[in-house]
Amino acid sequence: MIKLNLDIQPNQSLKYQNDQELYEIVIRTTSNATFYSVFRNQVEMISNQILIANTLLIQSKYQQTNGNFIFYSISDELPNYTKFNVSQFLYYATNEELING
């Protein structure tokens, strides 16, 4: 798994290039929740979904054979940008890593 760098900022965008595709993840925080959008090769796949701890970001109908992103929270807390890279992390995992746990 590859740990991606989240900034301690409420609104941000980050890019990840695997062997085949370029992903961009946009994170937006409101007073009540954190939302995300995912672009693959500059095409929006997922738009303004609520970010939930310890879940995959790309739903299975959009997932390809090369992996997925996981938003991980040590204490299963709701996403909070002040805890990014402290107790909440974003990872990219290949399908093999996801299958083997």
Regions found by a protein language model. Give the residues of each.
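Glutamate identity and glutamate-enriched acidic tracts
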Residues: 20-24, 44, 77, 96-97
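Intrinsically disordered, low-complexity N-terminal regions enriched in serine/proline/glycine
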Residues: 22, 61, 71, 90-91
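Broad hydrophobic/π-residue packing in well-ordered secondary structure
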Residues: 18, 27-29, 33-35, 88
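Acidic, aromatic-enriched beta-alpha/helix-loop junctions
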Residues: 31-74
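Aromatic-residue detector
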Residues: 2, 13, 44, 54, ...
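C-terminal charged interaction modules
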Residues: 85-101
